[in-house]
Design a protein with these regions (language model features):
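Conserved alpha-helical scaffold segments that buttress catalytic/binding sites
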Residues: 1-30, 34-149
Length: 149
């Protein structure tokens, strides 16, 4: 195909209506959140630059429907952002759509994990990082304490 990845996917913007997800297999979600990204300022920024480069790529030789659902903006509190992400992920997972999250910090992994609660599914998470981000139950959730031993 001569079309780029960006030309092949459904893209939601303020100008476009929310895309029909009936045949969508993968959904990209941006998260404009970085308040709990300790020592990693800007994790919720620059998503348009990431998209610009992603959209330039050429898709492989497999038919897969992808939608870019836009960005979840930073809530009044970080818990508001977690709630919005959790609700959207639960909806996508229930519809058998694989979510890909861009932006935000490692603390969003916990919200991603909790999206499976409503579905009563067991989930395993693999975290690839340069260190273990272990904290205790009592610790505030941050990018450096989102896992517990």
């Amino acid at each position: 195909t001569n079309q780029t990845f960006g030309q092949c996917m459904k893209i939601y913007t303020e100008k476009n209506n929310f895309p029909d997800l009936s045949n969508t297999k993968i959904a990209i979600i941006g998260v404009l959140e970085g308040r709990a990204s300790v020592g990693n300022y800007g994790t919720g920024l620059g998503l348009d630059e990431v998209r610009k480069e992603l959209y330039k790529l050429y898709p492989g030789n497999w038919p897969i429907n992808v939608a870019d659902l836009g960005d979840i903006i930073e809530g009044n509190t970080i818990e508001d952002t977690y709630f919005a992400l959790n609700e959207l992920l639960s909806f996508l997972i229930k519809g058998k759509i694989i979510p890909i999250i861009i932006g935000g910090g490692q603390d969003l992994t916990y919200s991603n994990y909790r999206a499976y609660d409503k579905l009563e599914q067991t989930v395993n998470i693999v975290a690839v990082d340069n260190k273990f981000d272990l904290g205790s139950i009592e610790d505030e959730l941050t990018s450096q304490s989102y896992l517990t031993p």
